[in-house]
Amino acid sequence: MAVIKCKPTSPGRRHVVKVVNTDLHKGKPFAALLAKKSKSGGRNNTGRITVRHVGGGHKQHYRLIDFKRNKDGIPAKVERIEYDPNRTAHIALVLYADGERRYILAAKGMKSGDPIQSGVGSEIKTGNSMPLRNIPVGSVVHAVEMKPGKGAQIARSAGAYVQVIARDGAYATLRLRSGEMRKVPVDCRATFGEVGNAEHMLRQLGKAGAKRWRGVRPTVRGVAMNPVDHPHGGGEGRTSGGRHPVSPWGVPTKGYKTRSNKRTDKYIVRRRNK
């Protein structure tokens, strides 16, 4: 994998930094694992904008990813590593011994031809998945479930990982990249290793249009709006907004805690670093 800075042959190329992976599959994705993906433009069923800065972008197919890794005891082989437009990580097409194919997240160092397996008896190696109760303390893992059988929810993006730092009774304690320490049931599954494509963070899109290709619309500052649109709007001439920074709905934006799920507070051992 190489990081390439483009030559400034045009204003749009001047600041582009690409991450090039020559090992990615160059053909079409596996058709049986594709699903339709319709765009909402950030609107809900009544037509109102519920998510700002969303709209347009290239048409995409959704890749059906196996986040549960529940084919226990059946050996599989990585057929190829593919690009996925729906996430920062790359994905791997794996072929199981019974003939079934599935997409999984491609772990760091995973390549075509690698053997992988899920379940309690699996070898401790990158790409293999098993419950946290069988994973050695100190291991680096990704694609971690929060509820047994629900599918991976933690550490799924490019370069992500968590570390298993303790196991006590029915819960394992994980240290997340953010610094948060969290308890997860030991029956939840995790996959050894880090998520691949960690160089994703080094890329630079170089121009606004590249964001538009990805379905991201512009962000307008509150002080540039009218009073009807934002608490910072209005005023004669250029203003500072006149108050501490808030969202369009008046919620403070600088360090204000908005977490309200008290039911799961007991699982957080330490809040994330600021």
UniProtKB/Swiss-Prot annotation:
**UniProt-listed Gene3D superfamilies:** 2.30.30.30, Nucleic acid-binding proteins, Ribosomal protein L2, domain 3
* Molecular function per GO: rRNA binding; structural constituent of ribosome; transferase activity
Q: Which GO terms describe its cellular component?
A: large ribosomal subunit
Q: Where is this region: Disordered?
A: 223-264
Kindly list the residue ranges recorded as spanning the membrane: none
- GO annotation terms (biological process): cytoplasmic translation
Alphabetized, the UniProt keywords read: Ribonucleoprotein, Ribosomal protein, RNA-binding, rRNA-binding
Which InterPro entries does UniProt cross-reference here? NA-bd_OB-fold, Rib_uL2_dom2, Ribosomal_uL2, Ribosomal_uL2_bac/org-type, Ribosomal_uL2_C, Ribosomal_uL2_CS, Ribosomal_uL2_dom3, Ribosomal_uL2_RNA-bd_dom
**What function does this protein fulfil?**
One of the primary rRNA binding proteins. Required for association of the 30S and 50S subunits to form the 70S ribosome, for tRNA binding and peptide bond formation. It has been suggested to have peptidyltransferase activity; this is somewhat controversial. Makes several contacts with the 16S rRNA in the 70S ribosome.
Complexes and interactors: Part of the 50S ribosomal subunit. Forms a bridge to the 30S subunit in the 70S ribosome.
Question: What PANTHER family does the record point to?
Answer: LARGE RIBOSOMAL SUBUNIT PROTEIN UL2M (PTHR13691:SF5), RIBOSOMAL PROTEIN L2 (PTHR13691)
Q: What family is this protein classified in? A: Belongs to the universal ribosomal protein uL2 family.
According to UniProt, the name of this protein is: Large ribosomal subunit protein uL2
What gene, per UniProt, encodes this protein?
Answer: rplB
